[in-house]
């Protein structure tokens, strides 16, 4: 079950605070803890958010898994057959899938909390096939909500594109260069 975030009219292209993001994400009726079998060490913010939400489509390219779905995805992708030959269970356990883009691509982070993007067209999973975004989970949420505002505005003027680029560079000065999708048409 996926839930589209339906917030009130956003100010155009404003980086959301963590409080604004938290109140925008749909809460689950139940809090789902991290299964005891999971040894990955999560950032507190990630644990706090995903254990209390349902899987949420912020935009089509930014789907945030609730803990139940994240656990199932990671359980499936921990199968060695998805990974480059010779990858060890130890190496696989250094990654956590926390979201998707709706087209088979995945959002994941490493044990340091850095966000990566995996394009399923790259076939086997391995660090070389993961694009480092040079952002953390909070910045990923801010990125997702910026694109949500941009897409919802339905106004793709040059002025709006410039505002979006400006806000993206506030998250991380290299973020535009690190985006995994070809956003040239929109920004």
How would you describe each model-predicted region?
Residues 6-107, 173-187:
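A surface-exposed partner-binding patch
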Residues 10-13, 17, 34, 129, ...:
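Non-membrane alpha-helical secondary structure
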Residues 56-166:
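Long, low-complexity, intrinsically disordered segments enriched in glycines and aromatic residues
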């Amino acid at each position: 079950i996926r839930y589209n975030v339906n917030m009130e009219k956003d100010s155009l292209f404003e980086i959301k605070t963590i409080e604004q993001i938290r109140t925008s994400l749909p809460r689950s009726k139940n809090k789902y803890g991290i299964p005891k079998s999971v040894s990955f060490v999560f950032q507190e913010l990630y644990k706090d958010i995903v254990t209390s939400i349902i899987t949420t489509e912020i935009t089509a390219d930014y789907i945030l898994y609730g803990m139940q779905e994240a656990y199932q995805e990671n359980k499936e992708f921990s199968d060695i057959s998805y990974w480059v030959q010779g990858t060890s269970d130890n190496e696989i356990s250094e990654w956590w899938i926390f979201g998707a883009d709706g087209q088979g691509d995945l959002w994941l982070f490493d044990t340091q909390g850095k966000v990566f993007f995996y394009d399923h067209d790259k076939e086997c999973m391995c660090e070389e096939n993961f694009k480092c975004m040079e952002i953390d989970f909070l910045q990923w949420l801010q990125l997702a909500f910026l694109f949500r505002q941009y897409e919802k505005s339905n106004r793709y003027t040059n002025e709006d594109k410039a505002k979006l680029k400006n806000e993206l560079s506030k998250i991380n000065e290299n973020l535009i260069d690190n985006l995994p999708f070809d956003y040239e048409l929109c920004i």
